[in-house]
Amino acid sequence: MAGAARGLLWAALSLCLLPEPLRAAHIKKAEAAAAGGGGGVGGELRYLHAAELGQALRDLVAEAPPGLARLFSIGRSVEGRPLWVLRLTAGLPELPEARQDGEKKKKEEEEEEEEEEGEEGGGGALPGRPQVKLVGNMHGDEPLARPLLLRLAQELVRGWAGGDERLGRLLNTTDLYLLPSLNPDGFERAREGDCGGGGGGGGEGGGEPGGRENSRGRDLNRSFPDQFGSAQPDLEPVPEVRALIAWMRRNKFLLSGNLHGGSVVASYPYDDSPTHRPTGVYSKSADDEVFKYLAKAYASHHPIMRTGKPNCPGEEGETFQDGITNGAQWYDVEGGMQDYNYVWANCFEITLELSCCKYPPTSELQQEWENNRESLLTFIEKVHIGVKGFVRDAITGAGLENATIVVAGIAHNITAGKFGDYHRLLVPGTYNVTAVVMGYAPVTKENIEVKEADATVVDFSLQPTVVAPDPNLTQFTATPAPPSTLTPSVAQVEPPATTSLHQAVQPVDFRHHHFSDMEIFLRRYANEYPSITRLYSVGKSVELRELYVMEISDNPGIHEAGEPEFKYIGNMHGNEVVGRELLLNLIEYLCKNFGTDPEVTDLVQSTRIHIMPSMNPDGYEKSQEGDRGGTVGRNNSNNYDLNRNFPDQFFQVTDPPQPETLAVMSWLKTYPFVLSANLHGGSLVVNYPFDDDEQGIAIYSKSPDDAVFQQLALSYSKENKKMYQGSPCKDLYPTEYFPHGITNGAQWYNVPGGMQDWNYLNTNCFEVTIELGCVKYPKAEELPKYWEQNRRSLLQFIKQVHRGIWGFVLDATDGRGILNATISVADINHPVTTYKDGDYWRLLVQGTYKVTASARGYDPVTKTVEVDSKGGVQVNFTLSRTDAKVEEGKVPVLNTPDTSDPNEKEFETLIKDLSAENGLERLLLASSGKVSPYRYRPYKDLSEFLRGLYLNYPHITNLTSLGQSVEFRQIWSLEISNKPNHSEPEEPKIRFVAGIHGNAPVGTELLLALAEFLCMNYKKNSAVTKLIDRTRIVIVPSLNPDGREIAQERGCTSKLGHANAHGRDLDTDFTSNYSWYSGTREPETKAIIENLILKQDFSLSVALDGGSLLVTYPFDKPAQTVENKETLKHLASVYANNHPLMHLGQPGCPNKSDENIPGGVIRGSEWHSHLGSMKDFSVTFGHCPEITVYTSCCYFPSAGQLPGLWADHRKSLLSMLVEVHKGVHGFVQDKSGKAISKATIVLNEGLRVYTKEGGYFHVLLAPGLHNINAIADGYQQKHMKVLVRHDAPSSVFIVFDMENRIFGLPRELVVTVAGASMSALVLTACIIWCVCSIKSNRHKDGFPTLRQHHDDYEDEIRMMSTGSKKSLLSHEFQDETDTEEETLYSSKH
């Protein structure tokens, strides 16, 4: 009350101090406004048309105290309506020629309406006061913002004048701009009550278009320049957009809200993604945390929005966590305004959907205002978070306009305003902030603490420099320079590069790093720069040193669709150390310069960089500083040369594969690397494939991509002057000369088993080998010289990853990326394949190419592509399915339907996330409790361990015995589920079995570890909990407990315990025809068949065995046709691909070191064929696909190897829990809704499954298009196609019609024939009756009537017959009577 009184007193005093004419005018207008009521300023809320809106805004300005409000127009719409902006802030300076005479008001207002904003517009900026804008009615049929912003302005003006503390503080510290209608033309066409946007009233959405677009039919929120757009938009048809862009360029807006309608949610950048998928892609900006904070600030104060459940008609199931969503994840909007604000204009904008109804009735406006009032005020207040201050010249104290403000770790800079003032929005935390200005030394303020309250004040004082400008450096800024004209051309939309005096920070850590030192160095930078780094290991060396890799990316740990991946590998030969140190220098350089140096920032933002400083850490530790050309430490600890240890195309590598080699091969198969360099020492040259030839002599061995490799090699050597000269080591090799510092590997000397050739031939990666100097292990003091010689080359080579062509291969059916599609270039015999999102990269030199994209089950597409010398060209392909044209309109193609069940959606998202790259790694990292098997458990301990799990986790486990072995040991089965021992047909069921051979107990221990891991993480790890809740998991750890009891540890090849107590190999006892086989079956086999395979309905089975490192799929029986081979092979591949070594296809087992199993997957009969296998029986009679995993070369390795084996297999085991939820699941019912059980589902005209109780079925299928035939007695057969994806389940819902065929014929035909037959029978009966009646009448007359002339005719026939004599006897005398009494002669034949 006291505050209000003081405010009124102040307002009265202010009026008294005004000149008499102005004071009278002010009072008069205030009275008019108060009396007007319906104008939307003082009375009930209502929609105002253009002229009314302009008048209401003018009246409000007149009502406001002096210096508080200003009205101006930023431009005009297509139809010439002004785009009004109301500026509200305290202390506005008077405009030139201030209005002193109230009687001139009307004329001046009319002139004001006709003019548009000049250079100063609504007045100049105020030092240190952040600018906020709220834009409404961008879509003409979404006009709720018009009355809301008008009411907001009214409250602010009257609250400030009335002394309201909050509103006074807001306008005293904030420069607020309100634009009620960006699309006034569309509003005039829209209709009140049109909730759906179609133009009709009452929310029906019918009738003519409802005014969404401007008068030229353009959607303003699809018309802005877009960072992911293929071309610049045409701005000529959208003067509204042109006006807004020009206005934004003249100001330094910091925060903005774009007010829409049609839902209730706060959406934040980015609004689209490089793939432009319609929905489901989280497109993360550099300031993702800030945007989520801002969106929550609005949503949390809105009574509906904060629930996350708008419950809009037709979208009742749509939910948004916390009431916010990433724009692209909701749906893709290319050319949106909020992204333009952030990318091009320094401004943080979010989009606010305020109401389910686009154009709500006037009667609802008051409620909408109450819903949004607090959210609007809170959102405006959030402009004051983060850090703020001034950037000044240290000598003159003048503010430095356009100073760049860089926050370490956030790849988005802002620029200071006209007075050197800046304001950087940040969420609470600790930051390092740098100010950079051309001509001044940059200054960094470290450990700045940002709190939840008002912004932390940080001022910068910069010293001018006298350094000459470097034309190769550009200032990294997100804000373009002000344009020279009001209306920007298309070219002016691009931010122009400006020169900068910023110098990159050079490394200072020049010394030789031994392993411990290197490890600390890597951990230090991973810890100091967590937003752009990730430190991981790809394996261990012989001496168990980690093979570390530092990833540097703006989104570490994530493969961003469309972003290429690059790698550097150093120190492959332990005594060639320059590469090791250069890569550590490069890590330091990239981390320290990210966000401040444009080149580094661009590289990190556009490339996922992986750096392995040392591939041979053991050899390094043996090497000696000063070694010029020696070999000590060159090889690994097993004394093998790692660069002769890779499989070779021309020669058989007989050396056993080394752990370092296997780890790197696995690494290369895991990531979609495009380009690589292997850093060596001993010369100064770049050599490129091939490294050897068929004859093993020094001769040019040309690869299909020879021109590309030469260009790649030159890109490095050109930046190293000494290398480019071509005569590197005159003291050591005086005759050696390499033109331009490059050479073909084999032409120099033959290297069989080299890494660079393996890269090219086995992955999509192009690799060259770089010799960095003549001295292999130079003195530490020489290391800065090597950095100076190579730093430009190292950066330039990374840039080459963007040369050639890149893009996406998409499915025409659903627009999703196609995995493993092939990209072929005519006349270059080297195809590459697509990654998980359908993204690909193909390095090419300048030229014209015919490029073909193809994939199994799709029609190939060929395009002619022009590649220039400047960079990469995006070329996307959309492939149609091979049979789409034949089946179009006849057979429905089904994909996973949208479900309104949020829990179902959440689980589908989980499956997709776990299927993504690093998805399972993230699950494992987030898991609680350390599970690591360390000993083998004999039968007694195994039984006690399983009982312990059952007793400790009774709500999710059930322990039963399937039967007994020969020696009466129990065959235990542990079920893990949220409802154990309770049938839930809709849940897929998976079984893990092990120990069918007792001498291979690794599988048993792995399954016990898996069971413990699942139980320990239930209700602690969200992903594990959801998997258990949605899956029935059965674990049978030991099928042959008798054999296990006699097997011996370290018996790598021993067969002791292989068979059961009767000496029978149980994997030969599952005979094909079980129906007649009974008496001689082993008790273990009988228990497994009767109580596991046939009794329980499983979707997938995984059997663990030993003796190799691979996966087999059915059948083990030779010459057996495999109906669903692709699916079985796919399931096996999923397991192998998630194992670090198995997918390499080189088990490397003793006596089989040359064994090669492509992908680590092979059909059982091709590896070890035999009859009576468990997996053959499971597929044939259990209708369950089963794969057999051979866990290690040694049957019974030492217990010390168990932790490593668990670490290798746990991801693969978990991948099976994810995979069992994919494929196809669905329900079968008739039209009445009755579920149909035991219906037959025939897949691809071969595999059969049967519906369970409730009509449910589930079957695993390989990704691709599959045919489904559904058959049930008494119903018509159904045929359809279903699209199965690699990362999500597909659902089908089959509704049967009654059978319309009888005996295989159409019902109508059968009825017609039956009716005709009945009619014929009736007609025949009638004829017979009539004939009988006539004959009966002749008998009643006495003698029958003779047929006249008939005898003469027959006699003539007889006389003319010239047959045999017997023919004379063949003719009978015929009387005309029918009675038996009159028959005189009867023929006998």
From Swiss-Prot:
Catalysed reactions, as listed in the record: Releases C-terminal Arg and Lys from polypeptides
SUPFAM superfamilies for this protein: Carboxypeptidase regulatory domain-like, Zn-dependent exopeptidases
Any one biological process term the GO annotation gives: proteolysis
PTM note: The N-terminus is blocked.
Source superkingdom: Eukaryota
Transmembrane stretches, start-end: 1309-1329
Comp. bias regions, Gly residues: 195-209
Record: residues binding Zn(2+) 2: 573, 576, 680
Cellular component, GO, one term: extracellular space
Acidic residues bias (residue ranges): 109-120
UniProt-annotated binding residues for Zn(2+) 1: 139, 142, 260
Keyword Lipoprotein among record annotations: yes
InterPro entries: CarboxyPept-like_regulatory (IPR008969), M14_CPD_II (IPR034224), M14_CPD_III (IPR033848), Peptidase_M14 (IPR000834), Peptidase_M14_domain (IPR050753)
Record note on cofactor: Binds 2 Zn(2+) ions per subunit.
Primary residence: membrane
Region of interest: Disordered: 95-133, 188-235, 614-639, 1367-1389
Comp. bias intervals (Basic and acidic residues): 96-108, 210-221, 619-628
Subcellular location: Cell membrane
Name this protein carries in UniProt: Carboxypeptidase D
Organism: Anas platyrhynchos
